[in-house]
Amino acid sequence: MSPQTETKASVGFKAGVKDYKLTYYTPDYETKDTDILAAFRVTPQPGVPPEEAGAAVAAESSTGTWTTVWTDGLTSLDRYKGRCYRIERVIGEKDQYIAYVAYPLDLFEEGSVTNLFTSIVGNVFGFKALRALRLEDLRIPPAYTKTFQGPPHGIQVERDKLNKYGRPLLGCTIKPKLGLSAKNYGRAVYECLRGGLDFTKDDENVNSQPFMRWRDRFLFCAEAIYKSQAETGEIKGHYLNATAGTCEEMLKRAFFARELGVPIIMHDYLTGGFTANTSLAHYCRENGLLLHIHRAMHAVIDRQKNHGIHFRVLAKALRLSGGDHIHSGTVVGKLEGEREITLGFVDLLRDDFVEQDRSRGIYFTQDWVSLPGVMPVASGGIHVWHMPALTEIFGDDSVLQFGGGTLGHPWGNAPGAVANRVALEACVQARNEGRDLAQEGNDIIRQAGKWSPELAAACEVWKEIRFDFKPVDTLDPNDKKQRDNEDTLADKFFGDKG
């Protein structure tokens, strides 16, 4: 390097390493309506001050790096840098803090969840100065939301397509999830739909394996759909899983489903990836297909309380990327999910405007500016005794999906579907009559079983089945509501089934 070049490069530049907090911790910053806001749960390494840890997150997820670089002088850092603008201690946890970071909108490509996540949950999660890091929530501003198509159709359009109103929809995942031939698989689909279900579903790991290639499955399932529709007079569907090893193959399967005239297909959005999911959502809107989303792999990312990404963030990302249904946990079944936390992200999926509510884990007010809503799917270890609780918790705009709770009926698949449909209709009627499902749920199911032998048999089989494990991911003590009665809703439902 010549002396002249060295002198010019050194003007206004001091090489070396300086604390992140000198540039990226700005407690006086007033957030803008166009900022993307993030709440991170930060656990610093011993000796690292919380302000430095929060600033490091802001820096490493936006414009910063580990040392000063002279090219900083070629742009406006004040315009593009992320800012840690508030830090609060987590009560009841040692050395754990919530760091709030604001990102300028220009840091992100329009309509790309992939780019959004690459920055905000990228390399910063491996930063050595942090023992653990978790993204608890995001505020997506209207200016950015408007760059996304979102769900292909949304809740109201789905109801209109299916001509089903005033109750939750009923589904069933076909079991065993792997190993059936296409013809036997289609037979199970037909029996469940004929028995009264609205949907059946491919399991998430059913793609195109040697025992059942995708094209054969699609054909036999389409036959089952049309036969059950003709016999019941109701519109039926099966979630045909279009997830594949390449986007081209995925879209080929979606095209074949459209040619068969089926109403809905399916995608595993986390294992398949956000780019593939957004592409499929666009195809579904253009071609009149509903899109069911499975969240396989989510617990790897969201289950641990101190590291990863909370599912409420993954739910928001899905609403941006596109999907008409997404699995959301059950509260009362076999899968992880605390009631208040689950209800929080269910509202974020369905509602147009959701206020900040820390008692449900919602850190920011979210305005979706009329982006279509997503139907939550309750699935995993549920059966007829859960029906009152599920109806109460999830309301009408939901899908209640019973796999083993349908196919495990002692009399077969169709009677299992009948039992679930009768239980649902009884709960909806009781609710509409003003009865308290929380207090009278078990009695409602018992009374309905007197005139439905299928339901009575199901009640007998599953009367002792419960999944009583405390959830791993819970609200922080300072975020919990003070309740007069600490009994959970599930406890009320499981009092006496005699």
From Swiss-Prot:
Mg(2+) binds at residues 201, 203-204. Signal peptide: none annotated. InterPro entries: RuBisCO, RuBisCo_large_chain_AS, RuBisCO_lsu_C, RuBisCO_lsu_C_sf, RuBisCO_lsu_fd_N, RuBisCO_lsu_N_sf, RuBisCO_lsuI. The modification N6,N6,N6-trimethyllysine is found at residue 14. One of its GO terms (biological process) is reductive pentose-phosphate cycle. The modification N-acetylproline is found at residue 3. Coiled coil: none annotated. The disulfide bond which can form in the large chain dimeric partners within the hexadecamer appears to be associated with oxidative stress and protein turnover. The basic functional RuBisCO is composed of a large chain homodimer in a 'head-to-tail' conformation. In form I RuBisCO this homodimer is arranged in a barrel-like tetramer with the small subunits forming a tetrameric 'cap' on each end of the 'barrel'. Heterohexadecamer of 8 large chains and 8 small chains; disulfide-linked. The disulfide link is formed within the large subunit homodimers. This is Ribulose bisphosphate carboxylase large chain.
